[in-house]
Amino acid sequence: IEGKSLAAKLKKLWRNDYFQTAVIIGLIVAIVLGFFYGSQLVLNTAYPTLTVETGSMCIPYDGACNGWSHPFDRTLHVGDILIVQGVKPKDLNVNYPNSDVIVFHEPGNPDKLIVHRIVAEQEINGKLYFQTKGDGNGLYLWPSVPPVSEYDPWTGGQGISQDLIVGKVVARVPWFGHITLFMRQNPIGLPIVIAVIILLVVLEFVLPLVKEKKKPVEQKETQPGT
């Protein structure tokens, strides 16, 4: 009897419209989190996606490097979402100008990630170091071969140690990163995005339920002869 009572309660709970809405929202959150942590495993890096915040990797066209114009050129624009894949340092392509664009921790500031292209490689005491440069930095813009003086001055010009490399950029999605930048750079950005998400949930799930409950109950037709 207790088992039947529990089953009846669960069945009644499942029929509750608000409970169903909560379950749907929970599933959406679980899918988002599952995608993020799952992509970490698949791409073999703790940072599977990043947003381009500066124009150091962008080559200006007609003076524009804002992420909205020429979005599909072979450079990285502000507002791009980058897909990053973990890779063994020895497997990186160092043949400039077609070398890999890598993501690495800034020397001396491990909390900051840098996205630049490899321009040269050297081995010191059995460890690989990579000289890097932003495609849009300096006078020699990619794909022009830059002089050593335009290499990034990391660790006194020695380059980036293989231990600091997070991965390489394998793909990018234009424009959508501006949402992330808006949240980071604007004090009210995150509250606005959260409010929009809540509003969409209300319009999509909650409002239809409220309207459904307000519908008048249809009167049963009276059978003839009663």
PLM regions: where:
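Protein maturation boundaries and topogenic segments
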Residues: I1-D91, R172-T226
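Short beta-strand-centered aromatic/proline hotspots
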Residues: V52, V101, I114-A120
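Loop/turn positions that initiate beta-strands
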Residues: G79, N98-D100
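Short coil-to-beta-strand transition motifs
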Residues: N44-Y47, E106-R117, P153-S161
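Extended, hydrophilic extramembrane loops/domains of integral membrane proteins
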Residues: V119-H178
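Extracytoplasmic/periplasmic, Sec-exported soluble proteins
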Residues: W68-R74, V94, E106, P110, ...
